[in-house]
Amino acid sequence: MRRNRSHYSAVFGAELLLISALVLVVSGPALAQTAAGSFVSVSGQVQIQRAGATIGAASGVGVDVADRIVTGADGHGVIVLNDRSRLELGPASNITLDEFTITGGSTSTRVSLVSGVLRSLVNAASGGAPANYQVHTPNAVASVRGTRFDTAYTE
């Protein structure tokens, strides 16, 4: 029996749609963004600004690349990144986590400090490789390979 082309096109289209849907379902979790770290301590007012929404920070809440963290006049927050480095934010602080990557045993982190105080405790990457850690302010850049230091910026 001879079938017309439109029948085969419809069957092929349905199969293609089914395969595409299956690929999305299977790969969806792999495409989801993994948090760069999480809050381990929060006191006072601490908020995360993420993709146009504002989220109240609390212990255990994840921090993603591109998140802006803002503390109130009474706010303090401690974030532990996935490489075990710590970011400690003081009152009236405003930072953005611009970059956090772990690739082949090396870590690269970039934080923008818009205002306030940030204490950084930077760990060496796994295997003892130095971490590439930068704090950018509106008029300076601090770049370290594994140490602890404070950065403050006021307008």
Q: What are the functions of these language-model segments?
A:
Residues 27-31:
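C-terminal region of N-terminal signal peptides and the immediate post-cleavage residues
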